[in-house]
Amino acid sequence: MTTYTVSRKVAWLRVVTLAVAAFIFNTTEFVPVGLLSDIAQSFHMQTAQVGIMLTIYAWVVALMSLPFMLMTSQVERRKLLICLFVVFIASHVLSFLSWSFTVLVISRIGVAFAHAIFWSITASLAIRMAPAGKRAQALSLIATGTALAMVLGLPLGRIVGQYFGWRMTFFAIGIGALVTLLCLIKLLPLLPSEHSGSLKSLPLLFRRPALMSIYLLTVVVVTAHYTAYSYIEPFVQNIAGFSANFATALLLLLGGAGIIGSVIFGKLGNQYASALVSTAIALLLVCLALLLPAANSEIHLGVLSIFWGIAMMIIGLGMQVKVLALAPDATDVAMALFSGIFNIGIGAGALVGNQVSLHWSMSMIGYVGAVPAFAALIWSIIIFRRWPVTLEEQTQ
């Protein structure tokens, strides 16, 4: 009995460590959103110009997720995790030392390489290492790590940047990654590659219209979100005219609301996943359309941020659960594609927000983001009516 208890405890420790790693990887992806103004000031650039860093990072992840996953498909997973963490940490040291914006972008590309591999294997590893009968809870823990990156990681990164400089934010993330790496080395057993799929999996996946429709929905809705979210920090300060501290509080509120979204999805996701996702997309559409009108009041912006955060967490969880349900025979390939497609949306949204801010007005980012959000809402209704049984039954 003791051995059983210990083994379950170790299994949960492994999953928790992976969740911490997910927190760190998501924090470093999101944290520049809260540091754009400081980085721009440091390199004497416009905030919108610095924002292109978000697009470069996201599109490198999108471009490299599948190739890297296929290149490493036969690599033992413990060794692979150690290698990608070394690249991740070294790249953050370079971010800390970066003497020009170009060097900073190069360091972020290194982080993106590690990111591309990490997110293509994490969900399947969490499922493998979970105690018997606890796969859903293991995935929920990974999702919680992701949510906490929004709740704690991004605001804390911004606070560190405000008081100690943006370089210290990246350095602190590197230190956190080093501690996590040491834990992974101690806790993880040898993990031979399993169910990783190969190029042979691609035609099979591409012949699944329900899966392809989910991928298309993902890229459109993520583009909508990041058109506005990428520039929310300068929007709050320069358009709404509120303080830097309020911008930090707003990011904390938006991220914290994601926990509520996670709880809602956890309670209702198995039975009503499609309805939840469509409702969340409708909520996102309303939030984006009301972003500028709400900018006249801190309370209005705060309330809007809560609903925005809830909506995006439900959307993110819903998309991931459906992808895993529709591709159980090639989870790594399917998740690599999902990670790549998600990041195409991030990069596209950040680029649209960048162009709107540079050539039109930053005040319009909400209205522009509402356009793809409306398209995503219509598409979600169409595909969930077209494949209601497939998606809901397999999700359960």
Curated annotation (Swiss-Prot):
It comes from the Bacteria. This is Probable sugar efflux transporter. Involved in the efflux of sugars. The physiological role may be the reduction of the intracellular concentration of toxic sugars or sugar metabolites. Coiled coil: none annotated. Belongs to the major facilitator superfamily. SotB (TC 2.A.1.2) family. It comes from Shigella flexneri serotype 5b (strain 8401). Its main location: membrane. The keyword Membrane applies. Keywords: Cell inner membrane, Cell membrane, Membrane, Sugar transport, Transmembrane, Transmembrane helix, Transport. One of its GO terms (molecular function) is carbohydrate transmembrane transporter activity. The chain crosses the membrane at residues 15-35, 50-70, 81-101, 103-123, 136-156, 170-190, 209-229, 246-266, 275-295, 299-319, 333-353, 364-384. It is found in: Cell inner membrane. InterPro entries: MFS, MFS_dom, MFS_Efflux_Transporters, MFS_trans_sf, Sugar_effux_transptr_put. PANTHER family: PURINE EFFLUX PUMP PBUE, SUGAR EFFLUX TRANSPORTER. It is a multi-pass membrane protein. The keyword Transport applies. GO terms for cellular component: plasma membrane. SUPFAM superfamilies: MFS general substrate transporter (SSF103473).
